Structures are given as C-alpha cells and as structure tokens.
A protein has these predicted regions:
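Glycan-recognition and catalytic cores of secretory/periplasmic carbohydrate-active enzymes
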Residues: 1-389
C-alpha cells in the first residue's frame, strides 16, 4: 500500500511541476496586462482573449497552493501576485460584486447572478496571504467572504434563477461556501467562517434523498423534492466534490463521526450513479428516476468529475482505512490517466465522449483552465504523503 501511494504521490507531483504549471505559465499567463488567459487550443495557442474572472481567482489560488504545498517556486508566487493584482484592478464592479468575464485589458464583458467569482477570489487571497506572508490579503479574503454572505442575504441583490412560481435552492452555493470558508480559516480566524460551514453542512441535508440514494442539485426551500427534469438531476462529480469537502471538514474536527458518515454515504451513492461500468470514468448527469436527463452532455466524461473522485477516494481511505476506497482510487486514477493527458502537447483534454475518445481538443475555455487538475495533484500528493507517514 505504501509503495502504491508513494508512486501516485510522485506522479501527481511530477505532472504538476513538469506539465501542468509550465503549460499555463507559458501559454496562459498574460505578461502584458497581468492575469491569465484560459481559452487556448490543444497546443496552447490563444483562441480567445476573453478572460474568465473565475479563473483569475482559481489560478491565483492554485499557484499559491502549489507554492505552499509542493515547492517554494518564485515563478508561481509571482504569477499568483500578478493575477491577484489584475483581479483587484479590473474584476470588481462599483457595487462590490465581481464580473464573470472581462477583456484582455480588464474591461467588463459579463456579470452573472452567482457569487462564484467572489468565492474564487477570496480563496486566492487567503492562499496568497499564506504564501507571501502578507496578512493584508487574509483580511481582504475575509472581507470578501462577508460581502458574499451579504450579497446572498440581501433580497434583490442577486437575480433569482427562477421566477416566483418556482421556489428552489441549489446545491452549488451551499457546497462551495464550505470550501471557501475553510480555505480562509487556514489564515485568519473569524466566527463567521465556522458559522458558514455549520450552516452549509446543515443545509446539505435538504439535498440528500435516501429514497433515491442520491444528493440532488436542486430542491425546494425546505428540501422538498421537485419532480421535474431539473429537480431530478444528479451531478455525480459535483456530489463527489461535496463529499471530499465534508471529509476535509470532518478531519479538521478530529474525524467528526456524523459528518464522516454522511460524506461517505454521498460518495458511495454518487459513485454508483456516476461510474460507467461499460467504459469506465464518471459520467456527467443522471436522473434520479432513471429517466433521460435533459443535458445533451449527460453521458460525456468531463475532466473535473474524475479529479474530484481521485481526491474523494483518498480522503475516504484516510477516514476509514477501508481498502475498497483504494480500489476506487486505482480505478478512477488509471482511467483518468489513460484518457485525459495529452502526451504530445501537454496538459489534459477536458471533454471526452462516453467511450473515452476526445470530443474536442482545446486545453481551456471560460470553464476549463488551471484549477481542478492542479488542485487534484496538489491535494492528492498531500494526502498520499500523509497516508504513508
């Protein structure tokens, strides 16, 4: 077991330091305006200069996280600083909320009803504070987190997804705030961070439906099952990501039994829904009644559900010592590494057909860039090393 974990730890580290980070520093980092481009073709050539604001925060987080966990590479720290500077200069609207897309030089293009741009910027600032030792960034992260809570709590501040006819709440914001709060808590203490995690953990109970053995993406305000195509959606990768966020929090609390058990249940159920017995890999969407999902990418294999499953299975093994989770880790890791990496041009493909063939070869766009893959490598390296101590 020790040799298995050490081998994977080294593979994750080498892939991060020799492939993923160099690819994005070479092809993504904007050395003129600051920040990072993510819309790049298979070979890294730029196909659109539009900048994803999500990825300004995500990349600054990853570069800082790699610096803090893998090696003190000054290029990573400088890249994180450049991207945070770009965020502060260009990515905030006058109301304190953030944009979704900006031009190469930072002029606003789109703003959306989410607070994901803010969440990613907050974890970037927190991680950069730890990397640089400049605690003003920890304070900025905490302020932004409090702003996020205010935006969510203020009626009319964020446009609702549905009109009043449908009262619903979504899984995404509940789970992302666990991770956002826990990353900030690493560098600065505030009661609001633990309060948010407690609230999110409680709220997640509403999305768990034992009758379907599933965590759903959308429910009514009090957890009511919404029997529509959208209400029946299971996003296995998303649920698996939530499971590891919960396991990370359980570990923080000395392996809290209740949180651990809930997280493992979500992981086990979501693996059953997501793992493709015929072709391997985690598929995109299922319907909890086994009806046809609406999303046309429903049976595709995207990059990020695989990376989240790699992290979650390692956490589950750490929590339980049950070797079934190592077997799941082996399955998902081997399948992922057999299908996603591009051995010719570097980095990973993002979008595969169900059978594992490449659907389109670009290495990045507004939604795919240096986040899930490098975060998986850093986190999994860390977990493998802990497990071999």
């Amino acid at each position: 077991m020790k040799s298995y974990l050490n081998e994977w730890a080294e593979r994750y580290r080498a892939d991060l330091t020799e492939n993923i980070m160099p690819f994005w520093l070479r092809h993504g980092l904007d050395r003129v305006n600051g920040g990072i481009y993510t819309c790049v073709d298979r070979d890294g050539s730029l196909i659109d200069t539009t900048k994803s604001v999500w990825f300004q925060g995500r990349f600054a987080f990853v570069a800082s996280f790699a610096y803090n966990t893998i090696e003190k590479n000054p290029e990573w720290l400088a890249a994180a600083k450049s991207t945070i500077d770009f965020i502060e200069a260009h990515c905030f609207d006058t109301d304190g909320r953030m944009y979704f897309e900006v031009t190469a030089d930072g002029r606003p293009l789109r703003k959306r009803r989410y607070v994901f741009s803010e969440s990613f910027a907050a974890i970037a600032m927190a991680e950069y504070a730890k990397a640089s030792g400049d605690m003003t960034y920890a304070e900025k992260a905490l302020k932004l987190f409090k702003d996020i809570r205010r935006f969510i709590a203020t009626p009319g501040c964020l446009e609702p997804k549905y009109l009043d006819t449908l009262q619903a709440k979504g899984h995404s914001i509940v789970m992302i705030l666990i991770n956002t709060a826990s990353r900030i808590r690493e560098v600065i203490a505030d009661p609001v961070l633990d309060q948010q995690i407690d609230e999110s953990l409680e709220s997640l109970k509403d999305f768990v439906k034992p009758e379907f053995k599933a965590l759903l993406e959308m429910v009514g305000p009090n957890g009511e099952f919404i029997d529509t195509i959208n209400g029946r959606v299971i996003n296995p990768g998303h649920c698996i990501e939530t499971a590891w966020f919960m396991l990370e929090e359980a570990k923080h609390r000395g392996w809290d039994k209740e949180i651990t058990e809930r997280a493992l249940q979500i992981l086990d159920w979501s693996w059953q829904w997501g793992w493709d017995e015929q072709y391997g890999g985690i598929i995109n969407f299922r319907d909890c009644r086994n009806l046809p999902p609406q999303d046309y990418s429903q049976d595709m294999k995207f990059w990020w559900p695989q990376t989240e499953a790699i992290i979650a299975t390692l956490y589950a093994y750490e929590a339980t010592g049950d070797e079934k989770y190592i077997e799941m880790h082996r399955q998902i890791s081997e399948w992922t590494y057999a299908h996603f990496p591009d051995t010719e041009y570097g980095e990973w493909y993002g979008y595969l057909h169900r059978d594992g063939t490449v659907a389109q070869p670009a290495k990045g766009n507004i939604f795919k860039g240096p986040f899930h893959i490098p975060r998986m490598m850093i986190k999994s390296y860390e977990l493998c090393k802990e497990l071999t101590k």
